[in-house]
Amino acid sequence: MKFFALFIYRPVATILLSVAITLCGILGFRMLPVAPLPQVDFPVIMVSASLPGASPETMASSVATPLERSLGRIAGVSEMTSSSSLGSTRIILQFDFDRDINGAARDVQAAINAAQSLLPSGMPSRPTYRKANPSDAPIMILTLTSDTYSQGELYDFASTQLAPTISQIDGVGDVDVGGSSLPAVRVGLNPQALFNQGVSLDDVRTAVSNANVRKPQGALEDGTHRWQIQTNDELKTAAEYQPLIIHYNNGGAVRLGDVATVTDSVQDVRNAGMTNAKPAILLMIRKLPEANIIQTVDSIRAKLPELQETIPAAIDLQIAQDRSPTIRASLEEVEQTLIISVALVILVVFLFLRSGRATIIPAVSVPVSLIGTFAAMYLCGFSLNNLSLMALTIATGFVVDDAIVVLENIARHLEAGMKPLQAALQGTREVGFTVLSMSLSLVAVFLPLLLMGGLPGRLLREFAVTLSVAIGISLLVSLTLTPMMCGWMLKASKPREQKRLRGFGRMLVALQQGYGKSLKWVLNHTRLVGVVLLGTIALNIWLYISIPKTFFPEQDTGVLMGGIQADQSISFQAMRGKLQDFMKIIRDDPAVDNVTGFTGGSRVNSGMMFITLKPRDERSETAQQIIDRLRVKLAKEPGANLFLMAVQDIRVGGRQSNASYQYTLLSDDLAALREWEPKIRKKLATLPELADVNSDQQDNGAEMNLVYDRDTMARLGIDVQAANSLLNNAFGQRQISTIYQPMNQYKVVMEVDPRYTQDISALEKMFVINNEGKAIPLSYFAKWQPANAPLSVNHQGLSAASTISFNLPTGKSLSDASAAIDRAMTQLGVPSTVRGSFAGTAQVFQETMNSQVILIIAAIATVYIVLGILYESYVHPLTILSTLPSAGVGALLALELFNAPFSLIALIGIMLLIGIVKKNAIMMVDFALEAQRHGNLTPQEAIFQACLLRFRPIMMTTLAALFGALPLVLSGGDGSELRQPLGITIVGGLVMSQLLTLYTTPVVYLFFDRLRLRFSRKPKQTVTE
């Protein structure tokens, strides 16, 4: 009593306390960062290594394996995958959540150093690492186009000047430049001219290398002067290499231009990038795992004007894709939903109390509680994101509940004629414990979430803490500011005013009277109610088992990613044509705003596309509907497939795949893996629960298999090293020299001119100069035949791996797909040597599925413990928790009605319902116990009176919570796919629980009371005997 009086009779101190809370919240709000979701990125580091011309199998055995053995010893590595393709190896290291990315990077560098002695000596550079996940969609894509500059010049400018500058911006993890390669002098050899002149390819390589040398020459000086010596030992352009003498034939000089075409070109001609229909260089910017996407994008945008000033006028720099507009739009939608929720909740209070003065009180207490929460969010290092703002939206219904319970009870005393200050003190004292019980038991629901590990725990922690803090501040405000305002603002009702009931008030009285009559009938038919309660429990179990489930709602971020997979024997020129064809189909779709794409590099049969959709208010279809429409058009393109998926804010794992979900096959027997992967992939492709099934196992690439006749080679004076050097010189785009420039280093690349390699007959023109100086054709000592070879070799850990990727068709859930895959694997009878498991997001979904029921049980158990401590009873908490089955049924039925799968967001809704619906029972039980203790009433009379007295606040709190969640259900626009499952779950659960718990709670109360009495009598009878 003294605690409440302290605030009621000291209004200035109470107002200033509330002002202080509000000011702290405003300051916190201004400093909070903005993000789409809480920080849930796994620390990921990518290690890259190259050995130009090496086959995928060679890269895997000689480069990937030594690095993997060394990197696998690093502490905190949760997953290690690698992919080796022509001349390139990528190793992706995913670390535990609590691993510091900078410390991990130091360990990675140390592991690379330790493995250096085991790597091939011919590698042009040491392996490097980047602190970015290559499977993440870029947060921004910049494009460079020009009508006058070549693609190589644009690439040089982008990689030399733009990329390093952007990489230095806080939050940027990686800037990947694509669409071409660095400028280079290319030497395109003419095999017939070489043969005629008796010049070997090694002669050309040695001559070029020796003619371009950068060595210190020293200095001259006398007594007074010093001269630095400088020579023309470097050749920098194709024109300078053209007259280079490489050989003498019969006394005549053979120049490089006589046997080759020398051009200023690019290092790798098998690269192409486009934006819409125009050739372009792409700068794909990815953020660090711990960086804030909005702050990083804003920093890049702030730097762009400065970069524009350094760009020549003939180069056009444009932002082709930016993830931030849809994120900002989504957050604006949530903020609008929050404002609407507050307005609706206050409207509910006004309708019930029919008093402007009374309505002002929650209109002040609710904003104070919500705004004050921002201060705690800032201190906890949180951000303004979809989940934390949704927590505040839902908290609107919770924080007003506390104020409603106090306000309604004080208003009831005022209606009875009590003076305002006395009514405020008495009313607050009566419900103080009730409000405390409601708040603490609600916070208790979230304790298991706070202790939950992994990605789901990290994802839900901000939601749980934000909501708990809002409830805690609401508890303080409702026991201090609310009663003070009631005591000083409200007036005692006059007798004639008490009788004046109109409109909603008259309807509420009629509802209360009807409820009283129906409650009497129910209390006389308790067995029927018991059957209904048991039925809801059984229905809960059946609905939870049968409802489709997924990990996280499929988001429409306005950005699509596309992976092109063409025939494994396709040429680069044909692949570039496929890229252009696919881009045209997509560009012609009315919902598409911008398209960028690239192909080439180590995998000539693959490419990537990034598609920006028009804003949601300019298109009527969702991203998934657009994908479904495009899928039909894209399927008509022969010889290649384009797999589209919507970019998501949550993506787990470092695998680069062409679809959203992955299923990985592992084996220590590579032959078994290559035998079973096609069988499994073809089986999965027939399942209606899966779409866009594809695999990263590509072992049918065209290969020309050369078999050396070693006896003949020995007789002709040729060794294997000379033969291999011939092939590398001719077809490996071999880098034979380096050109040093002030801003960068460029290569001299040698290969047979592509004009002479259009078919297999090019091998017949190759020759080796033996130890007698004779030209020996390759066909004299080697035979060749076409064969199949892998385009890539993949590992997970130290095992061979193949990852099958898939998307979900419209109307199918991840649980449907998972169950279908498990059935298919059982039907196929896959041997134990080939192990299958879900990866990435699908793996996290499997882990979350296993822990969901445990989490719900833990939340119920925690609430029971808290209520048991508060009521000093084993029985009364069970009465209060009997409200939960009806809420669960309502929530699951609502999800089924809206065709929404049970996701992590729906799980949050179930957890919230555990906290919400028990409030009705708490108010009933509190007043029933009070009536029994002080009113000398029987249990049935006490619970009946409690139900009628608390009918109005029960209706007010339920409607407040319902109207607080209703805007989430009805909201559209950006991010609605995240908000709607939460709103649907809460609204469905509240409606069903309100209909049932008004009757089941009194019956359960009486049942446990009789049970308590029965057990309490038995010991007494035993003692008497």
From Swiss-Prot:
It is a multi-pass membrane protein. The chain crosses the membrane at residues 3-23, 333-353, 360-380, 387-407, 431-451, 463-483, 528-548, 853-873, 875-895, 897-917, 953-973, 984-1004. Keywords: Cell inner membrane, Cell membrane, Membrane, Transmembrane, Transmembrane helix, Transport. SUPFAM superfamilies: Multidrug efflux transporter AcrB pore domain, PN1, PN2, PC1 and PC2 subdomains, Multidrug efflux transporter AcrB TolC docking domain, DN and DC subdomains, Multidrug efflux transporter AcrB transmembrane domain. GO terms for molecular function: xenobiotic transmembrane transporter activity. It comes from the Bacteria. InterPro entries: AcrB_DN_DC_subdom, Acrflvin-R, Multidrug-R_MdtC. Its main location: membrane. Signal peptide: none annotated. GO terms for cellular component: plasma membrane. The keyword Kinase does not apply. It is found in: Cell inner membrane. Induction: The mdtABC operon is transcriptionally activated by BaeR. Part of a tripartite efflux system composed of MdtA, MdtB and MdtC. MdtC forms a heteromultimer with MdtB. Belongs to the resistance-nodulation-cell division (RND) (TC 2.A.6) family. MdtC subfamily. The MdtABC tripartite complex confers resistance against novobiocin and deoxycholate. This is Multidrug resistance protein MdtC. It comes from Escherichia coli (strain ATCC 8739 / DSM 1576 / NBRC 3972 / NCIMB 8545 / WDCM 00012 / Crooks). The gene is mdtC.
